[in-house]
Curated annotation (Swiss-Prot):
Gene Ontology molecular-function annotations: xanthine transmembrane transporter activity
Official protein name in the record: Xanthine permease XanP
GO BP term, example: xanthine transport
Keyword Cytoplasm: no
Catalytic activity: xanthine(in) + H(+)(in) = xanthine(out) + H(+)(out)
Length: 463
């Protein structure tokens, strides 16, 4: 049976005809007011998460204001294009569900590490960014290949392995969040890092996020990040803490996307860590698409479900390739949008097309990314600390899908020790061969490889 025969195509609320928690199903076309309302909820739930990875990477690498503005704009634009590809489902590409795409946090740590190494080696901004985006294009093929052999990949990258890697990603990112809370790298250079006003501003944002997430009103919970950051921005203005930049910014009304704006290069030492993160991202995508299928009241088993999984993972890899071509960072499915589907009762993928169009339009206006750049570092840090802690906690949740017996505890302990140890004391590899140094220089790669190897050589314990 085709998808169209399984789903209603009229715009009548399904609750009127069957026992369902949904108001509009996958192929329904809600009236314009309901469509716009649901689309705005999706945008509020994801907007901060789309722009933050690009902002963190650009700030950590010390990119000029104009380059940062360009990359943030392209993050919004690419997320919109990627969402259309994921939702539309052309042939084998795409899940065909209301799966909104956005910039992935998983790549923040390895890209900052790789970019810093290139910068230390004397690379200028165009050379550094060309190498990062070129390596991302090559590494994204990993996810496309995995989409064709999902059954094999899931045997090697078990919940234990992927959970450990996600934990390392989250724990590595907490340092980035704390750096922003203290005032960022600029504050380090002028000896104002950790100033009481920075900690106060970040603390207010953090407290607001916690407070809003404890409210019974679901709309406040969905918009908690946006509300808290807006309040933090207003408080920063009142305290005279808005950043002042004398660097020139794009004055054009419309920003025309330029493929390969920085050129094309490859940084081979960064390839393996990025490939490993793409492997983990592919499994996260499986979980996100399964959750989307579930809240959309679609099958979570059988041929249609498997087709959507393969199409979704393939689209994820393709979208990350497209994102790199348009000079921004990898895309992945956003799990928070599943909460919006439950909140609104609208699973119609036509709402997703409206969200995608909103993202594209926002990305074409440089004024949006220009405003984002003026968010004070402590405001960003207060918000991202919650996000990064959540990533680490989600790794714990993934690991807990398997029995935490002696074997599992040993694998987790050794993998975390190796991954975090290499990150915290990189000189441990100073006498290692160059190939091994490149292989294990990333804590994510070191911990992930350790988890994969131990998972394969330690036989599972009998229950």
């Amino acid at each position: 049976m085709s998808v169209s025969t399984l789903e209603s195509e009229n715009a009548q609320p399904v609750a009127q005809t069957q026992n369902s928690e949904l108001i509009y199903r996958l192929e329904d076309r809600p009236p314009l007011p309901q469509t716009l309302f649901a689309a705005c909820q999706h945008l509020l739930a994801m907007f901060v998460a789309v722009i933050t990875p690009a902002l963190l990477i650009c700030q950590a690498l010390g990119l000029p204001a104009q380059d940062t503005q360009h990359i943030i704009s392209m993050s919004l634009f690419a997320s919109g294009v990627a969402s259309i590809i994921q939702i539309k489902a052309w042939g084998p590409v795409g899940s065909g569900l209301l799966s909104i795409q956005g910039t992935s946090f998983n790549f923040v740590a390895p890209l900052i590490m790789g970019g810093t190494a290139l910068k230390t080696g004397g690379a200028d901004v165009p050379t550094m960014m060309a190498a990062l985006f070129g390596t991302l294009m090559l590494a994204s093929c990993t996810e496309m290949v995995i989409s064709r052999v999902l059954h094999l990949a899931r045997r090697i990258i078990t919940p234990l392995v992927s959970g450990v890697v996600v934990m390392i990603i989250g724990l590595s990112l907490i340092q980035v969040g704390l750096t922003s809370i203290g005032g960022g790298y600029a504050a380090m250079s002028d000896n104002t890092f950790g100033a009481p006003k920075n900690l106060l501003l970040a603390g207010v944002v953090l407290a607001l996020i916690i407070l809003l997430n404890r409210q019974r009103n679901p709309y406040l919970r969905v918009a908690s990040l946006v509300i808290a950051m807006a309040a933090g921005y207003a408080l920063a203005w009142f305290m005279g803490m808005l950043p002042e930049s004398n660097e020139p910014m794009t004055q054009e009304l419309i920003m025309v996307p330029t493929p390969l704006y920085y050129g094309l290069g490859i940084e081979w030492s960064l390839l393996l860590p990025l490939m490993l993160v793409f492997m983990i991202t592919s499994l996260e995508t499986i979980g996100d698409i399964t959750a989307t299928s579930d809240v959309s009241e679609q099958p979570v088993s059988g041929p249609l479900y498997m087709k959507r999984l393969k199409g979704g993972v393939l689209a994820n890899g393709l979208n990350s390739f497209v994102s790199a071509v348009f000079n921004t960072f990898p895309n992945s499915c956003f799990g928070q949008n599943n909460g919006v589907i439950q909140l609104t009762g609208v699973a119609s993928r036509y709402v997703g097309f409206v969200v995608a169009l909103m993202l594209i339009v926002l990305g074409l206006f440089p004024a949006v990314s220009g405003f984002v750049q003026h968010i004070p570092e402590p405001v960003l840090g207060g918000a991202t600390l919650v996000m990064f802690g959540t990533i680490a906690a989600s790794g714990v949740r993934i690991v807990s899908r398997e029995p935490l017996n002696r074997r599992a505890i040993l694998i987790i302990a050794l993998s975390l020790a190796v991954g975090l140890g290499v990150s915290q004391q990189p000189l441990i590899l100073q006498f290692a061969p160059e190939w091994l140094k490149n292989l294990l220089s990333s804590g994510i790669a070191a911990g992930g490889i350790t988890a994969i190897v131990l998972n394969l050589i330690f036989p599972p314990e009998k229950q």
